[in-house]
Amino acid sequence: MLARSRVCLQTITRRLADFPEANAIKKKFLFRKDTSTIKQLKGLSSGQKIVLNGWIEQKPKRVGKNLIFGLLRDSNGDIIQLVDNKSLLKGFTLEDVVQAVGILSLKRKLSNEDADEYEVQLEDITVLNASNKKPAQMQDFKLSAIYPPEFRYLQLRNPKYQDFLKKRSSISKEIRNSFNNFDFTEVETPMLFKATPEGAREFLVPTRTKRSDGKPSFYALDQSPQQYKQLLMASGVNKYYQMARCFRDEDLRADRQPEFTQVDMEMAFANSEDVMKIIEKTVSGVWSKFSKKRGLLTLDSKGTLVPAKKENGTVSIFRMTYEQAMTSYGIDKPDLRAPDLKIINLGEFNAFSHLNKKFPVFEVIILRSAFSNMEEYKERWSFLTNNSNYNYRVPIVLPIENDEQANSNWFENFHAIATFENPHLITKFLKLKKGDIVCGCTREPNHSIFENPTPLGRLRQLVLQSEHGKNIYHAVNKDVASWIVDFPLFSPVIIEDKSGKKEKLAYPEYEKDRLCSTHHPFTMVKLKDYEKLEKTPEKCLGRHYDLVVNGVELGGGSTRIHDPRLQDYIFEDILKIDNAYELFGHLLNAFDMGTPPHAGFAIGFDRMCAMICETESIRDVIAFPKSITGADLVVKSPSVIPESILEPYNIKYSNSKK
């Protein structure tokens, strides 16, 4: 221990060199408290003495022998000009932290139409902490507000990111107020849990505890509070919520982080309807208060976009079944800002796929008036046939170049994957025109659609993510919400391709007679399908519900199983979990001691904040996000741990070089 302390002290000595002079340090802590923000100056009169804290926004500029102009930025991101007649700003640099004292004065107007602006006649300025030259060297990054990730703290000083963090805080308060008004109790649950097969990979935490057989013991960081909140229902907590920290060792992308926040809730003596009503009111309230688009839209029974919040104050969000979503939009989280951009099943016209009997449906989606000439088509739509954009097969994409093609032989381009009994009837139905794009592909039959998204569902998603697609097909510049209900309770297990071949599989392949939970194993089956559990569980629908906004899953929930025998049957007989009691005995025991019926939901809080702040990545609304590789580049984590420290945890490096 002494040796380690010595190393640390030596490191500090090398970095800081001499002991700092006392007055220089003390001065940084002796600052005035009677300060204002720049916004508060609007209520003051010219000639008043003021004190401002902030940062030097730009390097001060000498404009005369006894005149220097500087800019001060306060913690709100507001900026005011400093007028220095005493050369007080001499030597100051970008991002110095200062306290400025001066006289408030009106800035000279260039014209009578200009609004009043203030400046400060500087009397004194104190450096509370000087900046090095790094911020000045990164001036170009400051202008774009895109800094290297290791300088995240500089990026967060930008008003845009300050606004994101403040709005996130305000949204959190609003959600808490909403649940408190519904008489929920906020309860914190443990983050150190145990490893269980809930879906995603877990982060494991080693301990110094050994089992009786000598094997090391590990915690798992909680993927979600799912099991703890069900135990709270068993504990007599009637309505629970928390802003929960969750951890999943997943492949990362713009809308994923290894640690994230979810708004978690659960209700005893409740079903799906009870939960959905509260979520509708809470989410709608947040959108109405904080979104620049002022509220959510949804669909009515005719498919027309209407406000989710009615004039009488009630909130009702459209419900779409999983089957409807997959057949009309090819994905279980459809972007309904383009409600009329639908996929068409040509089976009604006796057009079928002949390549794979498990994928017999041939369907198309028509991109109307998508281009004016072939040069524009190639420039704007080439990504639709990019193999890397799809999990499996790529749709056939056909631009309609002229009216003759539209009215006669377009379907010949799809003969490789489909058979047409009456192509002329289909042509009459589709009413193709020059400038349209016909996209066609195959999928599984209705009631058995597990490939999600389908190729055309993915194509539609790509279209609506592109700027040109948004401009053409979005019906509104608003946020559109829908519920997706009646999911399959179980899904076939996809066989992972471990062949090492560069060519992708054209179709997903499933393991025979093996199922996994579509969401998680605690979801209750729809009562009308209960008898199917015994013989044909793959045909059962679950009492699960997802809330989708703009093609993004904002959250999901379900009515839970609270009967121990049914839960055990699903673990053992359907999911084939051999050690179910070892993994889930705590739940089964609680269920066997009078756990009430319960249902719940979880909202992806980071995702919600990103949508309301109108930014593509959740990283923008998280103070210190992880990179695409899962690293925190500010603090340089994760890091290598010396083997001597790992030893008490019963962990050794393999192939370690000593």
Swiss-Prot record:
Q: Which GO terms describe its biological process?
A: aspartyl-tRNA aminoacylation; mitochondrial aspartyl-tRNA aminoacylation
**GO MF annotations in UniProt:** aspartate-tRNA ligase activity; ATP binding; nucleic acid binding
> What Gene Ontology cellular-component terms does the record carry?
mitochondrial matrix; mitochondrion
Q: What is its main location?
A: mitochondrion
Q: Give me the reactions it catalyses.
A: tRNA(Asp) + L-aspartate + ATP = L-aspartyl-tRNA(Asp) + AMP + diphosphate
Listed transmembrane segments: none
Q: Which CDD domains match?
A: AspRS_core, ScAspRS_mt_like_N
Q: Its Enzyme Commission number?
A: 6.1.1.12
Query: Which amino acids does the record list as binding ATP?
Result: R248, D249, E250, E553, G604, F605, D606, R607
Positions of region (Aspartate): 226-229
Coiled-coil positions are: none
User: Which compartments does it reside in?
Assistant: Mitochondrion matrix
Asked if DNA-binding is a keyword of the record, the answer is: no
State the UniProt keywords alphabetically: Aminoacyl-tRNA synthetase, ATP-binding, Ligase, Mitochondrion, Nucleotide-binding, Protein biosynthesis
Work out whether the entry's keyword set contains RNA-binding. no
Quote the record's binding site residues for L-aspartate: E198, R248, R560
The similarity comment for this entry is: Belongs to the class-II aminoacyl-tRNA synthetase family. Type 1 subfamily.
What does this protein's UniProt record list under function?
Catalyzes the attachment of aspartate to tRNA(Asp) in the mitochondrion.
Q: What else is known?
A: Present with 1550 molecules/cell in log phase SD medium.
Which protein, by its recorded name, is this?
A: Aspartate--tRNA ligase, mitochondrial
Organism of origin is Saccharomyces cerevisiae (strain ATCC 204508 / S288c) (Baker's yeast)
